[in-house]
């Protein structure tokens, strides 16, 4: 059996409960895909987006809904080794990627205040724009369960507000475009287990400023949240699930003030 088929099989069989069912539940629970959609799956080269690409291929192949996929990779200024690693992994996993270039790393190079935040915002715009050029109406990103709960805690502790990462949202700058996060219910631990099971190696941090194709060493507020959640989990093993559910069970009668943003 070819390696990419073994990788596909592992998602459906070995990790059916941990990954596949949660992936399908996320799509269904949050109504992410409709018939006739043309979705650009955005690949950064990391484990999350590469798993997302395979899951999207599988649901297109075996699902009952008719929709189209494109697999896009934005090169913001990767070093040659990082770029080649993405290409090699895409070939191993039988993912037909389209690569386009941008100069984001050059733009944010001299910015000291929140360069990662600015880089992420700029990436989003480039991805939307390229997806539109491919006649797509949605982009799919690889954010997972842990990203969601980390974002929720970060908003409370560093921004003084309650805000979570949404499973889908309409773009305010690109008319007719929507962002979806199909791995919304999948836990990072299970993604890492899937990577180890298949003996795969993905980029951990492709930022030029680390210049390391295997290890992303940059600390961040998100890393602080990971450590905090890990400690809290020692007290209660369901703490992460409770944080996640808190955004689904907000009682406005117990909230002093709230705002509504109209997209």
Q: Which ranges hold each PLM region?
A:
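A structural signal for well-ordered alpha-helical scaffolds and beta->alpha junctions
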Residues: 16, 20, 83, 124, ...
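ATP-dependent adenylation/nucleotidyltransferase module used to activate substrates
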Residues: 2-154, 158-161, 166, 189-197
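The feature marks non-catalytic terminal segments
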Residues: 200-263
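A short glycine-/small-residue-rich loop at the edge of a beta-strand within enzyme catalytic domains
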Residues: 118, 140, 182, 186, ...
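Short, solvent-exposed coil/turn elements at secondary-structure transition points
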Residues: 75-77, 103-105, 171, 185, ...
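Short, basic, helix/turn surface patches
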Residues: 122-134, 168-174, 227-246
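Catalytic subdomain that performs nucleotidyl-dependent activation
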Residues: 68-69, 147-228
